[in-house]
Amino acid sequence: MDIKFEVEGYKFNVRSSCIIKDKEHNKVLLTNMRAITDHEAFLLPGGRLELLENSEEAIKREIEEELNIKLDYKLISVEENIVKSNKFHMLEFVYYAEIDNFDSIECLDDGWDKFKIVEIKEIDNIDIRPKTVKKLIKNDTYTNVTHNINYDWA
């Protein structure tokens, strides 16, 4: 059972996501939000935590379910996304992982139209939610866990 609930029209959920880069740090894998936006926008791959599941277990499960790969994960950020205008509150644990080669990914979840491999040098031209994730993607040294509070998710 996913950790999500709704109270008086306000939605809350807890999510684990991951910045998956190639070894050269030139590319990153993103998830298309086409199903919930009116234009092309992206999230980091991942999904909701299940009840009694920790955030690292969740990201391992989600990536294995969606992409059929096993990676080593490092927690790099906690994002609090609070969007009053949309009555939306999400707590997101962001992890980092590297992959030898994106060609080795076998997409199991809804086909490749759900995912996009993006050149990091082009990241500023792409709509990514929350927008603080762009800074995390461009970072090459994940030495400390960061904490961001986002009131404007778009």
Residue positions per predicted region:
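Acidic, metal-coordinating catalytic segment for phosphate/diphosphate chemistry
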Residues: 1-17
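Residue-level preference for beta-strand/loop junctions
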Residues: 10-12, 40, 87-91
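Generic short beta-strand segments
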Residues: 1, 76-81
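Nudix hydrolase/Nudix homology domain
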Residues: 37-41, 110-154
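Unchanged
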Residues: 49-72, 81-132
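Residues embedded in well-ordered beta-strands
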Residues: 17-19, 27-29, 94-96
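Conserved Nudix-box catalytic region and its N-terminal flanking loop in Nudix hydrolases
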Residues: 26-65
